[in-house]
């Protein structure tokens, strides 16, 4: 008898909160996922110098990741909808960790491009699986908050990555950045497979009481699509965001023809374009155009992510608690405020403090609505079709990550 089987009867007799252990694992997995994809930005200056390439070619190396990432999303969504989350996510973590290691072995620009493509292909299933895990493991009243923690991982990793990657590159060489970053994922892949199941009802660590908490309030075919808290105080806001009484989508055709899913996908494309344009090129821009040293660049380049970390958690909480599970308001706020902040950044004074403050608020504004882009689909689709809905949104959205680094490099 395994250790898990021995402790399961004891766990089942007491009220558990194991979903938060799962959420902690989701945070760690996605932080590693993002660290492995964004470390390229910190080492691009070293790669440009070694391979004697221009900015457009450097942007193409970074962009190849997103081509693979977008291509693998929808197939992963179908697989997860049919076979479940557990094995696919573990395999994805192992795969992208292996390709991260291979980045350090590349001897040509072409090799770097193909490995980045492979990194994208293997990372693609991960966010679909993680978002589906949140959808399965959390009640509606906690989904945006949990999604905020999940999205915050995307900002937590880049806070640490630039200074850490630059230090490793300057101490041992840029290749050791990839060797070092590959190791944690190999460990987490095993832990995920051992500790997480597709649904809480399958887990030996979840009590009956917690299972009842998770299933309380979940959408039914007759439920209001956006699963919101109805209150007279929200009547004007509901008219503005056009709340409708529609049942969750239960067919693949319905997902691909849904204006809500496709609209979310297009909006996500725009936001991802901004995010990865920043993450890829801010380090090089600060060194080449603003005259920052490599070490000071690492700190300043982390500012959008510090703001983003706070914004993601705060935005998810606001959507769940203050806005009665309405997702569109924070999405709209993010779109408008990010545009305003980008205009401000074009005219920011030539001051380290001003640049740091400006980049902090860019990250904050960009990420307040970020959890809503993921959580919105949880109410539009039912639990069985949500992995496919998530893959459509992520696939289309992350094409922005393919376009923006190359376009920014060209400009």
Which ranges hold each PLM region?
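Extracytoplasmic gate region of multi-pass secondary transporters
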Residues: 40-44, 247-313, 370, 374, ...
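Helix-breaking motifs and short loop linkers at transmembrane-helix boundaries and internal kinks
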Residues: 52, 84, 105-111, 122, ...
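Conserved MFS/SLC helix-loop-helix module at the cytosolic interface between two early adjacent transmembrane helices
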Residues: 71-110
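Helix-to-loop junctions at the C-terminal end of transmembrane segments
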Residues: 72-84, 312-325
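Cytoplasmic membrane-interface "Motif A"-like loop-to-helix N-cap segments
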Residues: 82-93, 320-335
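C-terminal ends and interior cores of transmembrane alpha-helices
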Residues: 94-107, 336-350
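Cytoplasmic helix-loop-helix junction between adjacent transmembrane helices
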Residues: 115-154
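Helix-loop-helix hairpin linking two adjacent transmembrane segments in secondary transporters
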Residues: 150-204
């Amino acid at each position: 008898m395994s250790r898990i089987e021995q402790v399961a009867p004891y766990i089942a007799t007491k009220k558990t909160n194991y979903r938060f252990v799962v959420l902690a694992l989701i945070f760690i997995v996605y932080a590693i996922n993002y660290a492995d994809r964004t470390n390229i930005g910190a080492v691009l200056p070293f790669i440009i110098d070694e391979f004697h390439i221009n900015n457009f070619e450097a942007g193409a190396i970074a962009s190849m990741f997103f081509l693979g990432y977008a291509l693998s999303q929808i197939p992963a969504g179908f697989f997860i909808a049919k076979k479940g989350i557990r094995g696919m996510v573990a395999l994805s973590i192992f795969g992208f960790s292996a390709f991260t290691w291979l980045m350090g072995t590349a001897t040509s620009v072409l090799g770097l491009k193909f490995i980045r493509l492979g990194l994208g292909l293997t990372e693609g299933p991960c966010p679909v699986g993680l978002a589906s895990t949140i959808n399965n493991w959390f009640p509606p009243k906690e989904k945006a908050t949990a999604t905020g923690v999940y999205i915050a991982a995307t900002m937590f990793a880049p806070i640490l990555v630039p200074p850490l990657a630059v230090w490793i590159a300057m101490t041992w060489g840029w290749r050791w950045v990839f060797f070092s970053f590959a190791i944690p994922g190999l460990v987490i892949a095993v832990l995920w497979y051992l500790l997480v199941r597709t649904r809480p009802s399958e887990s030996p660590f979840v009590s009956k009481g917690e299972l009842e908490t998770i299933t309380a309030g979940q959408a039914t075919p007759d439920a209001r699509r956006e699963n919101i808290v109805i209150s007279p105080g929200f009547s004007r806001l509901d008219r503005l965001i056009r709340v409708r009484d529609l049942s969750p989508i239960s067919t693949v055709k319905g997902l691909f023809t849904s204006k809500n899913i496709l609209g979310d996908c297009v909006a996500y494309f725009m936001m991802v374009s901004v995010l990865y344009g920043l993450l890829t090129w801010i380090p090089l821009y600060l060194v080449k155009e603003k005259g920052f040293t490599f070490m000071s660049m690492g700190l300043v380049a982390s500012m959008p992510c510090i703001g983003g970390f706070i914004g993601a958690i705060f935005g998810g909480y606001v959507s769940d608690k203050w806005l009665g599970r309405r997702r569109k308001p924070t999405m709209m706020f993010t779109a408008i405020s990010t545009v305003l902040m980008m205009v401000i950044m074009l005219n920011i004074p030539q001051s380290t403090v001003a640049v740091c403050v400006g980049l902090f608020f860019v990250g904050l504004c960009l990420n307040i609505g970020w959890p809503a882009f993921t959580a919105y689909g949880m109410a539009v689709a039912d639990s069985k079709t949500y992995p496919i809905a998530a893959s459509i949104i992520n696939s289309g959205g992350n094409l922005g990550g393919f376009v923006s680094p190359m376009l920014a490099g060209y400009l």
